[in-house]
């Protein structure tokens, strides 16, 4: 670049207003992506070294041994350097999206768009939170003597979901790491929070490690996050006790309330990436967004489709790495908008609506469905007049209402579940929560699958896979159970029912190892036992639990749509798929003929790549993909997901594409 151009660029930087933009790159450097993902490569090792041991353990549990993906590779250093040489200061590096964010003027935007390795330059939207968070200060005390702990005025909000019962069994969130994204946290001095095990905290507004108020914040900045933290994990006897009071925590301040409650998309995504790398098991966010800065254009209801907003795409990617993700459904029930708000529209996030202590839906609680028709919210919890800590005090509390109050209660229940069963994968957790909530037989777009229950979730049977062995776990809490009476009765297809004795492995936990079967066979079972008074119990009371051998998800009321026999719709082959070496990636399936096989493939960021509608023939059918998008370009290296609708069922298939 000659001197005159430099002067023009410099002068323009001074006089042109700057907004924040995402700069998306086409690749992660000139090296072949297959080589970059080689376990001996520098790029692979750098990605691996960015993860804590706990993060690696969680990924392996949920993803298997191929737990480093293209999204995890660092952004190519030379690309960043060339961008910075244009006078640009990079604000956030988002490896998952192969992008950086930076403040740019119009001249810089045009220069950057011309760079051969830049895919696109797009505005970072400012997400405005319509905060209907209502509160009043109250220091009343209420002692309750019929539970293991005295919950004080917080009793009604935890009792609705059966939390005191689980606490009485010495399950309180031990060995679980929870990440909270909120407005800030004044936790070090309040009596209910000061002894919490906070392993890391970061302020994504001011870029420092202080999440409590500091110079530049308004007084109410950290009020919301402090209150939310106490609902999840506060512990002051006779005043407030949250569900996960023995868990560990990571805190991220992502919301700026100095003028309006807002968070920039890149900060939210960066916080999730950071938490995931530290090994978080669960994330919870009480921030929901549907209104945006007019200068950056607004999202609409049609964007609440699980794959459009950056915050939603970020929670999708966190889930794919084994994190159980929670968020408030939103407080839009009384507004013209009415619907859930991003990131509650995510595919696998558990969005949480609000009910009162009697279980009645709160009028303000956002409703579903998503734009593409999925039921939302997933569950509800008490979110009316919940009792929690007041920031900037040592021992004052307040009542408040909102789905921002119900979300931490729900995420705390999952901490109890994971504490009881550390082997659970996040897809199992999500299924258990939906199956065990109060409305699972008739889910709707008001309360979803119903009121979440800690007791029901932990009593729901689950599977642990060790090599090729499938071990059933069933918690039985009834008093004076005859250990020798606990039986599982199961069958395959129309075979005769066979009873087998279960053994107690730990207190309350009875186990059974299923005999080896062929993948795809459907097993049905129920469990029986009796107590010392000869009372007989059958679980479930009628019908059967069921699961497809080779998978780890047990169903009762819900369809096992994505867990059907492998013989119906195959996995991708070859996988990984290398277009230079293989002509196509293939999926095989059987059909009776004249059926519609609908498939669309999305990339790791949730963007649709192709869509196909295939009319089937009788017998074997074949779907092939050559790696090219519907727009005609060869797709970048990364993880791709096929969503399939066929024969009244839905399937999900994963493919790694390497160039």
Where in this protein do the model-derived segments appear?
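Subtilisin-like serine protease catalytic core
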Residues: 18, 34-35, 120, 165-264, ...
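Autoinhibitory propeptides
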Residues: 77-158, 164-168, 194, 347
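Substrate-binding/access-modulating region of protease and related hydrolase catalytic domains
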Residues: 167, 174, 235-238, 251-348, ...
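Hydrolase catalytic cores
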Residues: 250-256, 281, 339, 383-447
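Glycan-association/targeting regions that enable binding to alpha-glucans and other polysaccharides
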Residues: 459-559
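Glycine-centered coil/turn sites that cap beta-strands in beta-rich domains
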Residues: 558-601, 622-625
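C-terminal tail/sorting-segment detector
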Residues: 558-563, 569, 573, 580, ...
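Glycine-centered tight-turn motifs at strand-turn-strand junctions
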Residues: 594-596, 608-635, 645-651
């Amino acid at each position: 670049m000659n001197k005159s151009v430099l002067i023009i660029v410099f002068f323009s930087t001074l006089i042109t207003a700057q907004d924040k933009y995402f700069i998306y790159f086409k690749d992660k450097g000139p090296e072949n992506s297959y080589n970059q993902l080689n376990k001996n490569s520098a790029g692979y090792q750098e990605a691996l070294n960015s993860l804590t041991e706990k993060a690696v353990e969680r990924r392996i549990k949920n993803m298997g041994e191929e737990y480093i993906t293209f999204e995890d590779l660092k952004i190519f250093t030379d690309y960043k350097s060339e961008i910075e040489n244009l006078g640009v200061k990079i604000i956030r590096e988002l490896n998952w999206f192969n992008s950086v964010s930076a403040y740019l003027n119009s001249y810089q935007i045009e220069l950057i768009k011309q760079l051969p390795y830049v895919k696109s330059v797009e505005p970072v939207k400012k997400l405005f939170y319509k905060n209907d968070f209502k509160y009043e200060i109250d220091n009343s005390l209420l002692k309750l003597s019929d539970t293991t702990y005295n919950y004080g005025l917080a009793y009604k909000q935890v009792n609705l979901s059966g939390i005191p019962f689980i606490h009485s069994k010495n399950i309180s969130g031990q060995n679980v790491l929870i990440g909270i994204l909120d407005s800030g946290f004044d936790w070090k001095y309040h009596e209910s929070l000061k002894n919490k095990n906070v392993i890391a905290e970061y302020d994504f507004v001011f870029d420092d490690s202080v999440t409590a108020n500091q110079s530049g914040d308004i007084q109410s900045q950290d009020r919301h996050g402090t209150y939310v933290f106490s609902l999840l994990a506060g512990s002051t006897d006779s005043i407030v006790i949250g569900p996960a009071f023995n868990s560990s925590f990571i805190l991220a301040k992502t919301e700026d309330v100095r003028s309006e409650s807002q968070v920039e998309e890149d900060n939210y995504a960066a916080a999730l990436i950071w938490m995931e790398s530290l090994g978080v098991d669960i994330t919870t966010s009480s921030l929901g967004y549907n209104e945006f800065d007019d200068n950056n254009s607004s999202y609409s209801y049609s964007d609440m489709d699980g794959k459009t907003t950056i915050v939603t795409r970020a929670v999708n990617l966190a889930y794919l790495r084994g994190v159980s993700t929670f968020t408030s459904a939103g407080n839009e029930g009384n507004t013209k908008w009415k619907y859930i708000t991003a990131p509650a529209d995510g595919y696998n996030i558990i969005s949480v609506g609000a009910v009162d202590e009697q279980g009645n839906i709160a009028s303000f609680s956002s409703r579903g469905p998503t734009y593409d028709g999925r039921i939302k919210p997933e569950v509800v919890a008490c979110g009316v007049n919940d009792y929690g800590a007041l920031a900037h005090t040592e021992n004052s509390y307040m009542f408040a209402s909102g789905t921002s109050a119900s979300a931490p209660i729900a995420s705390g229940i999952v901490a109890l579940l994971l504490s009881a069963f550390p082997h659970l994968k996040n897809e199992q957790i999500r299924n258990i929560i939906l199956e065990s909530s109060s409305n699972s037989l008739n889910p709707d777009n008001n309360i979803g699958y119903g009121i979440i229950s800690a007791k029901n979730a932990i009593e729901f049977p689950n599977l642990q896979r060790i090599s090729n062995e499938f071990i059933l776990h069933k918690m039985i809490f009834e008093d004076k159970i005859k250990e020798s009476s606990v039986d599982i009765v199961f069958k395959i297809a129309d075979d005769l029912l066979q009873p087998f004795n279960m053994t107690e492995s730990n207190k309350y936990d009875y186990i059974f190892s299923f005999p080896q079967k062929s993948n795809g066979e459907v097993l049905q079972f129920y469990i029986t036992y009796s107590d010392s008074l000869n009372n007989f119990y059958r679980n479930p009371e009628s019908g059967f639990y069921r699961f497809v051998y080779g998978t780890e998800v047990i169903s009762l009321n819900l369809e096992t749509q994505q867990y059907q026999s492998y013989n119906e719709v195959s996995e991708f082959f070859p996988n990984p798929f290398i277009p230079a070496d293989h002509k196509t990636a293939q999926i095989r399936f059987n059909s009776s003929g004249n059926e519609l096989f609908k498939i669309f493939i999305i990339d790791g960021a949730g963007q649709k790549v192709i869509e196909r509608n295939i009319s089937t023939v009788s017998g074997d059918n074949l779907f092939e993909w050559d790696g090219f998008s519907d727009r005609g370009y060869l797709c970048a290296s990364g993880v791709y997901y096929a969503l399939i609708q066929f024969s009244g069922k839905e399937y999900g298939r994963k493919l790694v594409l390497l160039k």
